[in-house]
A protein has these predicted regions:
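Conserved ABC ATPase signature
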Residues: 123-127, 131
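Hydrophobic anchor residue at the start of the ABC signature
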Residues: 137
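Conserved signature/switch motifs of ABC ATPase nucleotide-binding domains
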Residues: 143, 174
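Conserved ABC ATPase "signature" region
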Residues: 101-118
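Helix-to-loop junction immediately C-terminal to a conserved catalytic motif
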Residues: 52
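Catalytic Walker B motif of ABC-type/P-loop ATPase nucleotide-binding domains
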Residues: 148-152
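Q-loop/switch helix immediately C-terminal to the Walker
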Residues: 81-95, 105
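Helix N-cap at the start of a conserved alpha-helix in ABC-type nucleotide-binding domains
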Residues: 159-161
């Protein structure tokens, strides 16, 4: 859960699918947490996938991404592992040597986000959508990263849980370059971060 002073730079980035233009000549610098806002289908997920290196832009470049803590559009949890085990996958070798201590901290974090003993004992495939989302968000926050890229991390959470998750995200992200894609206006208000609009 490191904090860095790097800057994420997007330079003249464009993405087209055939004749459809998602964004064109997009340039911005992200050095603090920010919300990436646009209605569904306007390219938020595609932009994050480009920043993660999972998709190529039509043109333009990206600098300063470094190591990424990510919440994907799909949760991408290991279905046979528990929530705690999924989060522990991102522990560094140093942390893994003291994994008992860190596992207790991870468990406490999951409890704070509303996973009870029953949920903590289940494999990820049996968790609800909201429980999976909370696990994915916590995994991103535990990763040793230079940048956080979060695609709709509050999906499936009720308002009370979303507020707890947003508070944890604000506390853990610090001033690390962060892009959180959402069209949820309540989440935007809760975070209080600057908003970058697509489209």
């Amino acid at each position: 859960m490191s904090e860095t002073n790097n800057k994420l730079k997007i330079k003249s980035l464009s993405k087209r699918f055939g004749e459809k233009i998602l964004f064109e000549n997009l340039s911005l610098t992200v050095d603090d947490p920010a919300v990436l806002w646009a209605p569904s289908g306007w390219g938020k997920t595609t932009l994050l996938r480009i920043l993660m290196g999972l998709e190529a832009p039509t043109s333009g470049s990206v600098e300063g991404v470094g190591r990424v803590g990510a919440v994907f559009q799909e949760d991408r949890l290991c279905p046979q592992l528990t929530a705690e085990e999924n989060v522990a996958l991102v522990l560094t070798a140093e942390q893994y040597k003291a994994k008992t201590q860190y596992k207790e901290q991870i468990r406490d974090d999951l409890i704070q986000l509303g996973l009870d003993d029953e949920a903590l004992a289940l494999p990820a495939r049996k968790l609800s959508g909201g429980q999976k989302r909370r696990t994915a968000l916590l995994r991103a926050l535990w990763a040793e990263s230079d940048t956080l890229l979060l695609d709709e991390p509050f999906t499936g959470m009720d308002p009370a849980v979303m507020k707890k998750a947003a508070a944890m995200l604000k506390a853990r992200s610090g001033r690390k370059p962060t892009l959180l894609a959402t069209h949820d206006k309540e989440a935007i208000r809760e975070l209080g971060w600057k908003v970058i609009e697509l489209g």
